[in-house]
From Swiss-Prot:
Reactions it catalyzes: Exonucleolytic cleavage in either 5'- to 3'- or 3'- to 5'-direction to yield nucleoside 5'-phosphates
SUBUNIT field: Heterooligomer composed of large and small subunits.
Main location class: cytoplasm
Catalytic class of the enzyme: hydrolase
Organism encoding this protein: Clostridium botulinum (strain Okra / Type B1)
Keywords: Cytoplasm, Exonuclease, Hydrolase, Nuclease
GO cellular-component term (any): cytoplasm
GO molecular function, one term: exodeoxyribonuclease VII activity
GO biological process terms held by the UniProt record: DNA catabolic process
Protein's UniProt name: Exodeoxyribonuclease 7 large subunit
Length: 403
């Protein structure tokens, strides 16, 4: 019998065509519990459906996911309607879901909510019990698996932020039956190490079953009773476990937990330099301001000192003296001008000037000036005044001019 050789692509396409032609697989209704739920930024939803013995990968595209009437959650029992087909590129078959009906809440989810409510009522989640996260830790305890990416991520973050921080690793199981016990033991041991400042409890992402060790009641009490502050970084940002609610600080990822626990040395140095610069500037401004005040007060004191007052008064006296001299000089000049003007006026009206022109003056014997002939009728003698002397004359007759 001749067997035809197929390429991988041909084989996957053949299986796909076979499944797509099957009536039952094209109209499948599958009941199971949701796990590994991931909602992509594109809007597509990826998850697994499982029961006690098996699981199948599922995808629900955005166009169908848009019509969902409720939010999907890990641990939720649902009935998924769709078709089974092959993803040719990977050679894997999966359920392409078109609709989902809620069947009920899964057993793990019920147990999770029950324990969460119990511990909440007991006050284990209250903020008043949260211990303060130290800002400058020197030694950080880490409880996680010694293998895998989580520990490497924490170490890398620590080296990048501060090489001087010491990590004390407690290797623990993070999945399986004995995982909770080893996590509790790690908390107890690290609490006995005196110089451990803070503890990181970490694990990578996974399904609700894979993270179930962190939903243990005894572990929750161990976290609550820890003398050292505990940061949890369990799973991805959308994953929440019981210890996340009890811990002193919940980080969305293990790397984020390391970011919180380990202070950035460069940032601290820059902050110190900024503080130093600000203090220096503040002190310089204060000194400058006080110096200005001092100079102002000094000027006021100097201005009001007896010596300055006397000097200023002397200056005032000199100014007044100068002003007085100016006024006196001005007054004298004014009076000189007036005197000169009056002298000129007096000179202009001086009778002697008239006599120089050949005229004479007549006075009686009492030296009274005679200006009219009528006055002569009463006199016998008169004085005649010339420019260069006088003569006494006797009146013999008086002649009157015709008008």
């Amino acid at each position: 019998m001749h067997i035809k050789t197929l390429t991988v692509s041909q084989l996957n396409r053949y299986v796909k065509n076979t499944l797509d032609a099957d009536f039952i697989l094209n109209n499948a209704s599958v009941k199971g519990e949701i796990s590994n739920l991931k909602i992509h930024s594109s809007g597509h939803i990826y998850f697994s459906l499982k029961d006690g013995g098996s699981k199948i990968n599922c995808v629900m595209f955005k166009s169908y996911a848009y019509n969902l009437k409720f939010a999907l959650e890990n641990g939720m029992d649902v009935v998924a309607l769709g078709n089974v087909s092959v993803y040719e590129k990977e050679g894997s078959y999966q359920l392409y879901v078109k609709d989902i009906k809620r069947e009920g809440i899964g057993d793990l989810y019920v147990a999770f909510e029950k324990l969460k409510e119990k511990l909440k009522e007991e006050g284990l989640f209250d903020d008043v019990h949260k211990k303060e996260i130290p800002k400058f830790s020197k030694k950080v305890g880490v409880i996680t698996s010694p293998t895998g990416a989580v520990l490497k991520d924490i170490i890398n973050v620590t080296k990048r932020r501060n090489k001087g921080i010491e990590l004390l690793i407690y290797p623990a199981l993070v999945q399986g039956t004995n995982a909770s016990r080893t996590l509790i033991e790690g908390i107890k041991i690290l609490n006995k190490v005196e110089d451990v400042d803070i503890i990181i409890l970490a694990r990578g992402g996974g399904s609700i079953e894979e993270l179930w060790a962190f939903n243990n009641e005894e572990l929750a009490y161990a976290v609550y009773n820890s003398k050292k502050p505990i940061i949890t970084g369990v799973g991805h940002e959308t994953d929440f476990t019981i210890v996340d609610f009890v811990s002193d600080r919940r980080a969305p990822t293990p790397s984020a937990a390391a970011e919180i626990a380990v202070f950035d040395r460069e940032v601290l140095i820059n902050e110190i330099l900024n503080y130093k610069y600000n203090i220096k500037n503040s002190m310089e401004n204060i000194i400058k301001e006080k110096r200005n005040y001092l100079n102002l007060y000094k000027q006021k004191i100097e201005a009001n000192s007896p010596t300055n007052i006397i000097v200023n008064e002397y200056k005032n006296i000199d100014n007044l003296k100068e002003l007085l001299n100016m006024k006196i000089e001005g007054k004298l000049n004014k009076e000189k001008n007036n005197l000169s003007r009056l002298s000129s006026l007096l000179e202009a009206h001086n009778p002697l000037n008239v006599l120089k022109k050949g005229y004479t003056l007549i006075e009686d014997e009492g030296n009274n000036l005679i200006t009219e002939k009528e006055a002569l009728k009463k006199l016998n003698k008169i004085n005649i005044i010339f420019k260069d002397g006088r003569a006494k004359l006797s009146i013999e007759y008086i002649e009157e001019f015709l008008k």
